[in-house]
Amino acid sequence: MDLNAKQMTSEEFSKLIENQGVMGKSNITFVIGGSLGLSQAVIKRENYKVCFSKMTFPHQLFRIMLLEQVYRAFRIMKNEPYHK
């Protein structure tokens, strides 16, 4: 997660995750940056950047927000209803 990355809708996030599976990637790792961002060592290893918000959130809260968005992404992929 990176403040300078693209912000996306739930549908776009779902498509991003779906495309990773289509490309044969069975594991996705999410890295949540701290208030000072990410180290260069982490940045060099990234494949894609996502920004959820320009606001700062506590890590515990953001982990739940990320989990909810991943859940929502899979609901969208299966064309199942989800709360908007």
UniProtKB/Swiss-Prot annotation:
Can you tell me where the transmembrane regions are? none
Q: Which Gene Ontology cellular component terms are annotated?
A: cytoplasm
Top-level lineage group: Bacteria
Task: Give the EC number(s) listed in the UniProt record.
Answer: 2.1.1.177
Where does it localize?
Cytoplasm
Molecular function in Gene Ontology: methyltransferase activity
Q: Name one GO biological process term.
A: methylation
Predominant location of this chain? cytoplasm
* Residues the record lists as binding S-adenosyl-L-methionine: 33, 52-57
Question: Which keywords accompany this UniProt record?
Answer: Cytoplasm, Methyltransferase, rRNA processing, S-adenosyl-L-methionine, Transferase
Q: Which Pfam families match?
A: SPOUT_MTase
Assembly state and interactors? Answer: Homodimer.
Record's family? Belongs to the RNA methyltransferase RlmH family.
PANTHER family for the chain: METHYLTRANSFERASE, RIBOSOMAL RNA LARGE SUBUNIT METHYLTRANSFERASE H
**What name goes with this protein?**
Putative ribosomal RNA large subunit methyltransferase H 2
Name its species. Clostridium perfringens (strain SM101 / Type A)
What is the gene called? rlmH2
